A protein has these predicted regions:
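Extreme N-terminal segment that seeds HTH/winged-HTH DNA-binding domains in transcriptional regulators
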Residues: 1-63, 74-75
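Minor-groove-contacting beta-hairpin "wing" of winged helix-turn-helix DNA-binding domains
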Residues: 68-74
Length: 76
């Protein structure tokens, strides 16, 4: 859960959480939960999730297919 009482922005907390989960293998190559599901799970707004997903894309951890969702990329 993202903590709103910390000085670190919620989107950065979410990036850190999702990065740890991806690197730990919690999410294998394949689809991530929907934006709506991530909002509910982490108690954040849509814009926060979208910003976090953009940073994960920029880092090469995920890719997004229009109208399909975001996916964990294959890690070689």
């Amino acid at each position: 859960m993202v903590r709103h009482d910390l000085p670190e922005p919620a989107y950065q907390q979410l990036v850190a959480i999702l990065t740890r989960q991806i690197e730990a293998g919690q999410w294998h190559t394949g689809p991530l939960p929907s934006v709506k599901a991530l909002q509910a799970e982490y108690g954040v707004g849509r814009d926060t999730v979208l910003r976090a997903l953009q940073l994960l894309r920029d880092a090469g951890l995920i890719f997004t297919v229009a109208k399909r969702g975001s996916y964990v990329g294959r890690r070689d």
